[in-house]
Structure formats: C-alpha cells, structure tokens
Amino acid sequence: MNKQISKKPAQRTIALNKKALHDYYVEQRFEAGLVLEGWEVKSIRAGRVQLRDSYVVFKGGEAWLIGAHLSPLPNVAEYMKADPQRSRKLLLNKREIGKLFGAVQKQGLTVVPLDLHWHKNHVKVEIALAKGKKTHDKRETIKRREWEREKHRVLKSHG
C-alpha cells in the first residue's frame, strides 16, 4: 500500500488578523518572511503577538510591517530595552514588492497582514492586497453569514 504524503508542509498559525477580513475585500495574497530579533521569536513562540491594527508601508524599495505588537517576555525586559511595536522589515522578492507598490499607488489598494504562521522553522506573515469595505458592505456580509448559519441550523434540525 502506498501512503500519500502531502507535499505541502503543515502551517501552524500563530496569530490571525480577523479584523482585516472584516474590514477589507482580499484581492491577492502573498507570503513574506520577517526580520526578527531573538527576543521577538521567543515572544512569538509564547503566543504574545497581535496583528489587529497593523499594516504594510513601502520605504526605500522595501516593505515594512508597522503596528504589529510583540509583547516581550518578562525576563527580556530586565536585560534590554525591547520595543514591542517597532517596524519590522518584510522579506519579499523585488517583483513582489513592485507589484504591491504599484497596486497601492495606482489602484488605491492597501496591504494588510492576515496571519502569522510557522513555515518549517521560519516565521512567515501572510499579507494581502485589499480594498476597504464600506459600512453597508460590512453589514451585508454579517447578514449573509447569519442567514447561512440559520439555514444550516434549520436543515440540520429537519434533516
């Protein structure tokens, strides 16, 4: 018997940015590496990370993650001054940076982080080109989601 082995390694999610999926229409997704310090990796392993109000900016032909909060562990704060909200450089190909920068400049889209996950032994961030939702669009999405839940609930109870 041949066992089918998955070619794709398991991605363990560290943090999700649920607010981004609520506030934006996701156009296209990219995976980027992060430049981190040692204490930041330890904090990520401990799950002390938050992406809620973070976004991506472009400076000098590079992409930077702004506003991601990595809380330092108590023992790190004793030895050094840790900045939990410092800007972190994203590792992307030039072609990807050009595509993202062009879409932000020409189409008025924005780049937001969706999640932080482990890929093998590296921390990766999934970023997305996104278009902002209007308030009525958000309400419509909520109504549609509630209707789907109600429909499944009724079908489950009768079927």
From Swiss-Prot:
The keyword Aminoacyl-tRNA synthetase does not apply. Keywords: Cytoplasm, RNA-binding. One of its GO terms (molecular function) is RNA binding. It is found in: Cytoplasm. CDD domains: SmpB. InterPro entries: SmpB, SsrA-bd_prot, SsrA-bd_prot_CS. GO terms for cellular component: cytosol. PROSITE patterns: SSRP. One of its GO terms (biological process) is trans-translation. Pfam families: SmpB. Transmembrane segments: none annotated. Required for rescue of stalled ribosomes mediated by trans-translation. Binds to transfer-messenger RNA (tmRNA), required for stable association of tmRNA with ribosomes. tmRNA and SmpB together mimic tRNA shape, replacing the anticodon stem-loop with SmpB. tmRNA is encoded by the ssrA gene; the 2 termini fold to resemble tRNA(Ala) and it encodes a 'tag peptide', a short internal open reading frame. During trans-translation Ala-aminoacylated tmRNA acts like a tRNA, entering the A-site of stalled ribosomes, displacing the stalled mRNA. Belongs to the SmpB family. This is SsrA-binding protein. It comes from Coxiella burnetii (strain Dugway 5J108-111). The gene is smpB.
